[in-house]
């Protein structure tokens, strides 16, 4: 099978490209996986490659050669470009918000070793930086399975997977070097210990709110106000898009029971932890106030986004929510002072 053809083999213990050796058995090369002698096939009508002398089926030769090539590059360059790190807070039906921890960055390496057993797993490549280590998994034919993923999480070691499943089977060293050192599109975090730490911190700082029908009562940012003046939010319309919703509480059957919300503490980004609670509330309230004033300017109720209608009452002109059976919001403007007077406070 062409996907198992080798373009790199071991010669005198060194990974060697097919272009660097003589044809046939004179190449004096062995398979990097099984150790069997190889034949260098360099005819005029074929793409040059190594083949096993006995035509045996070795399904790991190509993959192992890529592991070795990646190791050689990382040892030479002593660095790797890592993808950005972000927390994904899954909210509903796959939708989620992202909180960025760090952008793409280079990790300077002290050492790189290949396929060395670590507890219950054998990572493809282990990169060391000081007293920390990074597992690098190279996906050629099989992605990391759940069993290996769970063991990586248990070991609390940051791990990236590099997807080479769609790259040219005759990838050159320069092409792989570009992927390792200049690109992140083919890299993804299988697990990141820093992300996990921050995720736990957000969840621990969140309050639990029970769902009643589709409603979450006592919304800490007063997304909506009912006709009795009680704050609430609608799960499907508000919570899943809210910057403070960090998790959805579900039962074993997957039914939604409530949410985890950081609204009371006004925490939505990593940078919020560097501010005091009073600073966070002030910033959040200013943003909410501006949003609600903008809704009023559009003729919409700031609490349910229903159209406001103009009415005339005992004390003159006022504007009322047209969703009157559920929302009693009204406002008027003092003719003398221009002051905005609302039945419910905007904050």
Where are these regions (language model features)?
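N-terminal cysteine/histidine-rich coordination modules
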Residues: 1-77
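Catalytic cores of nucleic-acid endonucleases
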Residues: 109-194, 307
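A generic structural motif
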Residues: 30, 126-128, 300, 322
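Short glycine-aromatic motifs
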Residues: 38, 104-112, 242, 308
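Short beta-strand-initiation
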Residues: 26, 120-122, 296
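Short strand-connecting beta-turns/loops that link adjacent beta-strands
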Residues: 45, 130-131, 314
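Active-site metal-binding core of divalent-cation-utilizing nuclease and nuclease-like domains
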Residues: 19-21, 81-137
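Non-catalytic C-terminal interaction segments of nucleic acid-processing enzymes
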Residues: 14, 158-160, 164-347
